[in-house]
Regions:
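Short, helix-capping/interhelical loops that line the mouth of catalytic, cofactor-
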Residues: 1-9, 56-109, 113-118
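An N-terminal domain-cap segment
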Residues: 2-49, 59
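Alpha-helical transition-metal enzyme core signature, strongest for iron centers
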Residues: 14-21, 44-59, 82-89, 93-107, ...
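Surface-exposed helix-capping loop/turn segments at secondary-structure junctions
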Residues: 27-33, 108-115, 150, 154
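Short, contiguous alpha-helical
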Residues: 32-74, 120-178, 227
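Phosphate-handling catalytic interfaces
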Residues: 117-120, 222
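Glycine/small-residue-rich hydrophobic helix-like segments
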Residues: 180-224
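C-terminal interaction segments
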Residues: 212-258
Length: 258
């Protein structure tokens, strides 16, 4: 396979995200696990259950990518979800951390040759290298970790090393996360930490690297961490956001979250 992306930084960020989550959960009792997460329909334990089942499923994809075997069929997922849903909040929390630790340890054990040769077909149609698969996993894990962290500390942010990687995946994610806006507007987006320049089209819900000839009618300046949370439907604090020609509520309606 050509154009393989080095997965080292993704593996490191996945480890950091897991360790951060483990630290958050370590201080929670039964009431804390049953408390609401940022998602109004999920408790903290529900988030952990989701991440635990996700770790099991991604482990199946990891095995397929390393061995060259077939990826898991969709019908393999339902028994995993049902098993997690049947567990108590305490068991969901403990098992979630255990299965994700096992996933991270497996990733860390892969040789450079195994990482470079990794190839798997996701969802039956999308070929991915290891960095691509970890991009999917990190976006899920880092944002859901924030869903828990922000309920414990309202000033919590998405982990910086995850931000550095995930900001460049926003063009890939926009179509999945966005809701097309009939009143389309082109927005020049500039971010800090790290610095990036994008053009956001709310009509087709696309994000692309800014071009030299782009002349958007609106502009948005904000930290990259806040832009990620905007795209993932999690931007409630707009103190560091400067918008012109478009409002933050209008942009939030384009990205309702998951």
């Amino acid at each position: 396979m050509t154009n393989v992306t080095d997965a080292t930084s993704w593996v490191l960020a996945a480890r950091t995200s897991h360790d951060r989550l483990a630290g958050l959960v370590a201080g929670l009792d039964g009431d804390g696990l049953r408390a609401q997460s940022y998602d109004t329909e999920w408790s903290v334990a529900d988030v952990l259950s989701h991440l635990g089942s996700g770790a099991e499923i991604f482990s199946l994809y990891l095995d397929a990518g390393v061995t060259g075997g077939d990826p898991p069929a969709p019908e393999a997922f339902m028994p995993i979800w049902e098993a997690w849903n049947a567990r108590s909040p305490e068991d969901q929390a403990a098992r979630s951390l255990a299965v994700n630790e096992a996933l991270i340890a497996r990733l860390e054990s892969l040789t450079p040759e195994q990482r470079a040769a990794f190839h798997v077909m996701m969802f039956g149609r999308i070929p991915m290298d290891l960095a691509g698969v970890l991009g999917m996993r990190l976006s899920e894990h880092a944002l859901h970790t924030w869903d828990i962290a922000v309920m414990l500390d309202p000033a919590a942010k998405v982990a910086p090393d995850a931000v550095d990687l995930l900001v460049d995946r926003l063009p890939v994610m926009a179509g999945f996360m966005g809701k097309q806006d009939p009143a389309a507007v082109a927005v020049a987006v500039t971010t800090t930490s790290p610095e990036r320049a994008f053009t956001l089209d709310t009509g087709g819900v696309t994000i692309a690297p800014a071009g030299a000839g782009d002349t958007p009618a609106a502009s948005l300046a904000l930290p990259a961490e806040a832009f990620i949370r905007l795209v993932y439907g999690r931007l409630d604090d707009a103190a560091e956001v400067t918008a012109s020609g478009v409002t933050v509520p209008e942009l939030k309606s384009v990205f309702p979250g998951f």
